[in-house]
Amino acid sequence: MFRGKSLLCLLDFQTHEIEKMLEVSFLMKSYVYYNKVPNSLSGKRVALLFEKPSTRTRVSTELAVSLLGGIPIVLNKQDLQWSRGELIEDTGRVLGRVVNGIGARVLNHLTLVKLKESSGVPVFNLLSDLSHPLQALADLMTIRERFGNNLVKIAFVGDGSDNVLLSLMAIVAKLGLELHVATPKELKPRDDLYKIISEIAEDTGSVIEFHEDPYEAVRGVHVVYTDVWVSMGQENIAEQKKRMLQNYRVTADLMKYAVKDAIFMHCLPANRGEEVDPEVIDGSKSAVWDQAENRLYTTMAVFSLFI
């Protein structure tokens, strides 16, 4: 079903394929807990490329390859010759000769496309300016750990053009869930991608709505999610975005409008006092640390299925 394919965006996959990735993610978690991890990548080499700094993604991907019996080869920005002018396609061609898979955290999504087309091996999106599919899988895994397979309602509060939000929208649409996005009218997803997601949502019965009022978006939801207001590479518009989003902080008062057993989620890193108050992210409703841990298991699942 997956062997030899790449994972650049969840929109490229059918609902049953996403469900399979989640199913194997839960299996991987149990394998790790009981020290029975299969050697799915025995003898396999996986290149992990990082144009952007990384903590959770670096740890989860390198550890995933190692636990599955593979050999991780980590290259940071200063190690990549394309930062000195080499064609991305040339890097892809060379890596494709010596590794069995490539994971890449990149500034531009087109870099992933070029690696996929030139390398001939599975390529995995470890975060781009467009999306973060492994994060979305970990998000849904975390939600299901708390609420089972029930049709939960989710609210995202913050930047409506956020790459993490786009992957969340994609998986919500594919699985027929309900998502309410609280964001200023100036910050919306790309029209072309929102059109695709809306068409999928119509087919699956998913509900995705945008609100300017965060209290309206959060009312009655099971999950309240946020991300940083200023992503890496947006430093030149940082103050502008902070002004636009100053009324979109997740506070304890805002959480009261969700259901009683609602959880708070954040993909990290977090800026306490900016997009979320400390009492929320460090409080009893926070599922952030489970969410971060689950990044390992979804990565293990995807690598074992695709490589």
Swiss-Prot record:
It comes from the Archaea. Keywords: Amino-acid biosynthesis, Arginine biosynthesis, Cytoplasm, Transferase. It is found in: Cytoplasm. Carbamoyl phosphate binds at residues 54-58, 81, 105, 132-135, 266-269, 295. Its EC number is 2.1.3.3. The keyword Repressor does not apply. Pathway: Amino-acid biosynthesis; L-arginine biosynthesis; L-arginine from L-ornithine and carbamoyl phosphate: step 1/3. It catalyses: carbamoyl phosphate + L-ornithine = L-citrulline + phosphate + H(+). The keyword NADP does not apply. GO terms for biological process: arginine biosynthetic process via ornithine; citrulline biosynthetic process; L-arginine biosynthetic process. It is an enzyme of class 2 (transferase). L-ornithine binds at N163, D227, S231, M232. Belongs to the aspartate/ornithine carbamoyltransferase superfamily. OTCase family. This is Ornithine carbamoyltransferase. It comes from Saccharolobus solfataricus (strain ATCC 35092 / DSM 1617 / JCM 11322 / P2).
